[in-house]
């Protein structure tokens, strides 16, 4: 939690509505400078099973999650951002489903909350409440798949996935760490399920959210996807997954280029320069196939960027 004083009470109240003797709450205060620390301390004093982890300096969401992982002692781990909340009984429902299915992890629906509007968003899984192979949730390249649902808090993960020191969030990434993590999860785990559960509420449009920033932190999707490409190139099933990785990287570049005028001028210039270099780093044959099969608007934009041509 970092400077979420406006939302901390409702977030922590939702945890109280999920309290159980077998559930521990690890509250990570990432060096907040507003009212967040006081709210967290007051709540933790009243709630058995709650532990406060305090960072002496702001380290970012990746390290905050890693600190929670390292301190966790339960059989399952899940995450909640400081401005979001749970419906009553959500965590117990997740645990019941995992106990019944016996899979490594499960993803869930979530409720997108924009002001007073509520919309249920579902992961693009082929079936619900059945155990599947996570690798089957990555491809094909031209379809929306489970790796396109990067909300790590919309899920629950068995402890053993983290026990070897793996499945930590990349702390060098200030944004897009969730996208890389979800890909690695699907490459590493052996079984998963998509649950018909929608008890986590995602507060959209918060001014302080990392999704709203206009500075260079937005550009961390580039090193995130560079790392992903390296993972896929080392994987035994490179040919199966490389087209999806390249296409998703291209889609992210096109998305950010499309809104570059909203960014700080120096960030927009750096975006165009680094995105061009990223396109030249991609496997050439796979990139050409991607540009051929993408929609014409994005394909033209990416081709112009790669070749150094200006828009007509």
Predicted region positions:
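Short, hydrophobic secondary-structure boundary micro-motifs
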Residues: 121-122, 241, 288
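Short, conserved alpha-helical segments within structured domains
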Residues: 177-178, 245-249
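Catalytic core of nucleotide-sugar-dependent glycosyltransferases
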Residues: 190, 197-206, 211-237, 252, ...
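Short, charged, amphipathic alpha-helical segments
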Residues: 239-247, 269
């Amino acid at each position: 939690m970092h400077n979420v004083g406006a939302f901390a009470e409702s977030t922590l109240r939702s945890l109280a509505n999920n309290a159980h003797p077998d559930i521990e709450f690890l509250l990570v205060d990432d060096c907040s400078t507003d009212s967040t620390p006081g709210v967290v301390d007051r709540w933790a004093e009243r709630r058995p099973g709650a532990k406060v982890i305090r960072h002496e300096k702001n380290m970012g969401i990746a390290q905050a999650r890693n600190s929670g992982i390292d301190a966790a002692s339960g059989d399952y781990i899940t995450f909640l951002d400081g401005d979001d909340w749970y419906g009553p009984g959500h965590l117990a429902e997740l645990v019941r489903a995992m106990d019944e299915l016996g899979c490594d992890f499960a993803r869930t629906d979530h409720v997108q909350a924009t002001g007073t509007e509520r919309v249920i968003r579902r992961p693009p899984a082929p079936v619900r409440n059945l155990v599947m192979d996570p690798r089957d949730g990555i491809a094909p390249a031209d379809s929306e798949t489970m790796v396109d649902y990067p909300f790590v808090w919309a899920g629950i993960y068995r402890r053993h996935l983290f026990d070897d020191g793996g499945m930590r969030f990349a702390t060098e990434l200030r944004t897009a760490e969730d996208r890389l993590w979800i890909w690695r999860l699907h490459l590493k785990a052996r079984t998963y399920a998509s649950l018909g559960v929608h008890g986590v509420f995602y507060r959209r449009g918060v001014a302080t959210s990392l999704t709203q920033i206009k500075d260079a932190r937005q550009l961390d999707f580039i090193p995130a996807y560079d790392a992903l490409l390296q993972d896929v190139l080392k994987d035994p099933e490179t040919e199966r997954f490389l087209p999806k990785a390249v296409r998703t990287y291209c889609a992210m570049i096109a998305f950010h280029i499309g809104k570059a005028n909203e960014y700080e001028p120096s960030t927009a210039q750096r975006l165009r320069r680094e995105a061009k270099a990223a396109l030249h780093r991609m496997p050439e044959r796979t990139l050409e196939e991607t540009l051929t099969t993408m929609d014409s608007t994005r394909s033209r934009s990416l081709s112009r960027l790669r070749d150094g041509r200006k828009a007509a």
